[in-house]
Curated annotation (Swiss-Prot):
Residues bearing PTM 2-(S-cysteinyl)pyruvic acid O-phosphothioketal: 116
Reactions the enzyme catalyzes: phosphoenolpyruvate + UDP-N-acetyl-alpha-D-glucosamine = UDP-N-acetyl-3-O-(1-carboxyvinyl)-alpha-D-glucosamine + phosphate
Record-given protein name: UDP-N-acetylglucosamine 1-carboxyvinyltransferase 2
Lineage: Bacteria, Bacillati, Bacillota, Bacilli, Bacillales
Class of the enzyme per the UniProt entry, highest EC level: transferase
Compartments where located: Cytoplasm
Family: Belongs to the EPSP synthase family. MurA subfamily.
EC number(s) from the headed UniProt entry: 2.5.1.7
Amino acid sequence: MDKMKIIGGDRLRGTIKVSGAKNSAVALIPAAILADSPVTIEGLPDISDVHILGSLIEEIGGSFSFDGKEAVIDPTNMVSMPLPNGKVKKLRASYYLMGAMLGRFKRAVVGLPGGCHLGPRPIDQHIKGFEALGATVTNEQGAIYLRAEELRGARIFLDVVSVGATINIMLAAVRAKGRTIIENAAKEPEIIDVATLLSNMGAKIKGAGTDVIRIDGVEKLSGCRHAIIPDRIEAGTYMIAAAATNGEVVVDNVIPQHVESLTAKLREMGVRVETGEDQILVCGTDVLKAVDVKTLVYPGFPTDLQQPFTALLTKANGTSVVTDTIYSARFKHVDELRRMNANVKVEGRSAIVTGPVKLQGAKVKASDLRAGAALVIAGLMAEGVTEITGVEHIDRGYSNLVEKLSDIGATIWREKMTDEEIEQVKNA
């Protein structure tokens, strides 16, 4: 196991390149199961979630080759067999295998997923969708069993706007008989990305990116080439890092429209943000204004940037309120920021941040992926050395983070942990 060390106080300057979208990648790979010939995906991020999904594909008879940039998935010889709990448990998005395997084989057995622990977020909307399409769903010994004689199109209204459920129902419906209509669908860019791949494979999908998606089932889908969209959350994280260090950073390979909510908030704080076609320039400033932020479904402020943004707000003049309407329990980073001298308190679904304070380097632990990003940003701002454990969470969603930040002037590196340190972290 590794730990990450950061010596804070450097101004970030230069160009940083964004990788492919994690939240697309974890759905595009399972989507390839639905094809009858190989699918090539360009620009996949080199993150642990992608590697775990690749090995799951291999366990059910597919082949997966990935050179760190491009993946080729050959689903031809796949069989419907139970997916083991071990790897599935490591990966929240392993639930997309349910929709894809149901769509192709009319049956699937998938262990209940793991990933980030963000409080209550059950997969009941996914199950509701599968049942509407004609599947029976049972929960047996910690695994979900899906079975269907045949899948038939249906009209499905989602009770809550859910990216996961929207994509999973799309995957199950593209080869069903007849028309499926998903109402109150999520509108995230990653949904459009998955729909684009499926359409390139031969699916008939209209309305992805709006709240009503119509899918006309087809008999077969074929392999194709697809280029993944850039990761808007990674882009946003680096935009926040630039503002936090009073830096001057060009974020390259980004779709500016995908980060408009963050751009607006940074400008409100006094940060200069200039957008180009696929680049964004962020220039920090010494004095930042406090702002209030409320996370919402896309195109609102993303819950995935709430934690990194909270770290930035410790530097702003005045009191800021950050409210997470999506995941109420997503404040595990606050205790760690407090260790670094932040003045933050949690009240219900909100974090109240009073600034400006000078953060101090400390030993902190990342409890989940975006908490890890928040602690990296805090470390870049802090005086002295910050040591972060729980780095495996960061590796789930940020490709080559240490190298990318080092290239633009951060003093950041990884070290192997001693057995003694690993024990301490486990018992903490």
